[in-house]
Amino acid sequence: MESFALHSLSTTATSTLLSHHHHHHPSRLSLLRRTSSRSPPSTISLRSLSVQPLSFPLLKPIPRFSTRIAAAPQDNAPPPPPPSPSPSPSPQGAKLIPLILSISVGLILRFAVPVPEGVTPQGWQLLSIFLSTIAGLVLSPLPVGAWAFIGLTASIVTKTLSFSAAFSAFTSEVIWLIVISFFFARGFVKTGLGDRIATYFVKWLGKSTLGLSYGLTLSEALIAPAMPSTTARAGGIFLPIIKSLSLSAGSKPNDSSSRKLGSYLIQSQFQCAGNSSALFLTAAAQNLLCLKLAEELGVVISNPWVSWFKAASLPAIISLLCTPLILYKLYPPETKDTPEAPGIAATKLKQMGPVTKNEWIMVGTMLLAVTLWICGETLGIPSVVAAMIGLSILLVLGVLNWDDCLSEKSAWDTLAWFAVLVGMAGQLTNLGVVTWMSDCVAKVLQSLSLSWPAAFGLLQAAYFFIHYLFASQTGHVGALFSAFLAMHIAAGVPGILAALALAYNTNLFGALTHYSSGQAAVYYGAGYVDLPDVFKIGFVMATINAIIWGVVGTFWWKFLGLY
């Protein structure tokens, strides 16, 4: 933006001077115009304009008028208005109150609470740093990655952890699988493959509003396992399609006409996104984080991609099939039929042209990656190696370049902050703090005489609805997943059942509010849904999902032998 502004400034200045000298230098003006029309300035030239002083070597200096002549016409002119005060600069650095509160949590635990029996001073000190880090994730005195880095620094400076121990999780296979998955998502957006797939479903199923919703839902479920970012799917593929269809039906954002079509499609896609993400291990970054944290507590799931899909398949598919219909009754659109939608989709597909070479490469690469994720254990190929093979193919064949990877800030940010949390969580386990906490929770639950199924339901509900306090699914996982899994295990809940149920809930609570996930902010920001409706429908659909997953999932997981 700065370069563009400076370029506009220089262009304006040039045109002013040229108009002044046109009478004297017509040939040079023509030369300048011809040069400008032939080669518009590139990004590099714009940047050079932003740092180089403006000079016009083809133009003679403007002759200076005498002070007497210049002042004459201004004698009767009104005085110039006083300059407007410059806006005060925005505050830099950490937010003071969240900073104080976040640090206070750790200081109080470290110095005001005595070290309990069964915990070493080193473990207690690490717990205080960890809790300050978690508090910072919630209160946000700084961006998540920056705050996690400060927590990492504190653990090393206080000699709580050695440098190698503090950075141990940066070599985690799961974390690097997450990073690479962000690059796959960029490939879907860059090639336009995701947009094309969704548009085909609109063409096939879009004759009615309900059919349109099912077409979008099924296309997201198809794309999800190879595009592990709900935010990228929402903002890069489905929201543009929904907005285009809505506007063509006369449904405008921030307008009474929004209820014609846009409001329903937004809510349906938003509520279905959680089930699409819960269906596949690689459909959302937080899924992989959950399994890594479970592994830190000794809960290891063999053949994770297949095990995850088998356990999620029945309840997730039923929810995906029911959600558009339920919302069609609870939050009905004013427009029931959309006969023009298939035509719009067909026109868009025609404009997109035939499937490009890069799209075919993307299809082949993702089919290879998903196949290796499914069969990797049999072939001896870890999931992260399968992802590395896929990314290497995309780089070699030019579908992605390294600048694409470098510009994917969310990937590198996740690597930084989650590696810190995973490393701290692992060291807390090694130092016996997690075992001590589990024993304490077990004693409390035993005193309440709760059976493990009752404790399971209570803890799952608490984990779900506490998300009203969070603005990030991955932040929620980092803050509470390990603690709640430890409580489940202490209450006698089978470890794999507890870990998977918590992970599935992590996807489902992403549709609770307008701030509960990245896709929530994307869809709410479109302007088609009023805030009270977001909260009301979020709570109602959360309850319905809990019933579907609780009832269907209970029998399905029993059939699969998870308990």
From Swiss-Prot:
It comes from the Eukaryota. Changing residue 206 to E: In dct; photorespiratory phenotype leading to non-viable seedlings under normal atmospheric conditions. GO terms for cellular component: chloroplast; chloroplast envelope; chloroplast inner membrane; chloroplast thylakoid; plastid. Its main location: plastid. It is found in: Plastid, Chloroplast inner membrane. GO terms for biological process: ammonia assimilation cycle; L-glutamate transmembrane transport; malate transmembrane transport; oxaloacetate transport; response to nematode. Residues 28-45 have a biased composition (Low complexity). Residues 76-90 have a biased composition (Pro residues). Disruption phenotype: Non-viable seedlings under normal atmospheric conditions, but grow normally under non-photorespiratory conditions high CO(2) conditions. Belongs to the SLC13A/DASS transporter (TC 2.A.47) family. DIT1 subfamily. This is Dicarboxylate transporter 2.1, chloroplastic. It comes from Arabidopsis thaliana (Mouse-ear cress).
